Regions:
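Short Gly/Pro-enriched turn/cap motifs at secondary-structure boundaries
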Residues: 21-28
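Basic, amphipathic alpha-helical recognition segments used for DNA target recognition
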Residues: 7-11, 41-42, 75
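Cytochrome P450 core scaffold surrounding the K-helix E-X-X-R motif
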Residues: 43-48
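Alpha-helical interface subdomain recognition
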Residues: 31-33, 37, 49-50, 57-171
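A short core secondary-structure module
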Residues: 1-17
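Short, well-ordered turn and helix-capping elements at secondary-structure junctions
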Residues: 17-19, 38
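Hydrophobic side chains in well-ordered alpha-helices of soluble proteins
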Residues: 4, 54-55
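Short coil/turn connectors at secondary-structure junctions
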Residues: 1, 28-29
Length: 173
């Protein structure tokens, strides 16, 4: 596999419309069409046959950035749920005062803290050019699974309101 730079004015190249995504909105995603495109030799990026290696070199940093977002989202979900449980009353007291709520929030907080330690270690490895794909993949797995767990547990702590969009504050670009 080799990498080539295909310029937008090359005959046979066309770009479809931008597709709407749920996340990562800062980068465009669209269909690209290559109909008998001819690319000159000077548009080869790097060495011939090393394209896959070049792509794999960036995977650890890409996986690290996904983990950063997942951990930040988990923390934001936890913080908003803590605020909600303090305000929400049931049986005349705040939901935050219930023992089960305290256990759940403490458990989630501890798991987020653990993921942050792993993230800090991986960031240190990246800065020293020592972060490998396997370790970065483990971090991504841990962080994204944790984000899902935190979202599910926090949804439960919101009760029926956890299923209502009116409670969520979504900012559109």
């Amino acid at each position: 596999i080799s990498l080539f730079l295909v310029e937008s004015e090359f005959e046979g190249f066309s770009k479809g419309k931008n597709l709407e995504k749920l996340g990562m909105k800062a980068q465009d995603t669209s269909e690209l069409f290559f109909q008998d495109v001819r690319v000159p030799k000077e548009n080869l990026l790097g060495e011939e046959g090393r394209g896959f290696i070049y792509l794999m070199q960036d995977l650890p940093q890409e996986r690290l950035s996904i983990a950063v977002g997942a951990i930040a989202n988990a923390q934001a979900l936890l913080e908003s749920t803590i605020d909600y449980t303090k305000e929400r009353k049931a049986f005349g007291v705040s939901v935050a005062s219930f023992q089960n709520t305290q256990f759940k929030l403490a458990e989630l907080s501890a798991e987020i803290s653990s993921a942050e330690v792993f993230l800090d270690r991986c960031t240190e490895l990246l800065l020293n050019d020592e972060l490998d794909t396997v370790t970065a993949s483990k971090l991504k797995l841990v962080a994204t699974d944790l984000q899902c767990k935190v979202a599910d547990e926090c949804l439960q702590l919101h009760g029926g309101w956890g299923y209502m969009l009116s409670l969520i504050h979504i900012s559109e670009p």
